Swiss-Prot record:
Classification via InterPro entries: Bacterial_rp_bL28, Ribosomal_bL28, Ribosomal_bL28/bL31-like_sf, Ribosomal_bL28_bact-type, Ribosomal_bL28_sf
Name this protein carries in UniProt: Large ribosomal subunit protein bL28
PANTHER family from the UniProt entry: 50S RIBOSOMAL PROTEIN L28 (PTHR39080), LARGE RIBOSOMAL SUBUNIT PROTEIN BL28A (PTHR39080:SF1)
GO BP term, pick one: translation
Organism of origin: Desulfatibacillum aliphaticivorans
Amino acid sequence: MSRMCEICGKKPMVGNNVSHAHNVNKRRFNPNLQKVRSLQENGQVKKITVCTNCIKSGKIVKP
């Protein structure tokens, strides 16, 4: 699925834009996703879409 972290499953959230006059419009909060080369368990290198929180916390192994 696009716009989804392949490690933790983080997806876009739905919220509101609120103006000073308190007019409300729907908006989406997208996770910060990056395409990263990752070392798989079988030794292969694969490109996966991962959020920056997973990269920072070391949940993926870079080749």
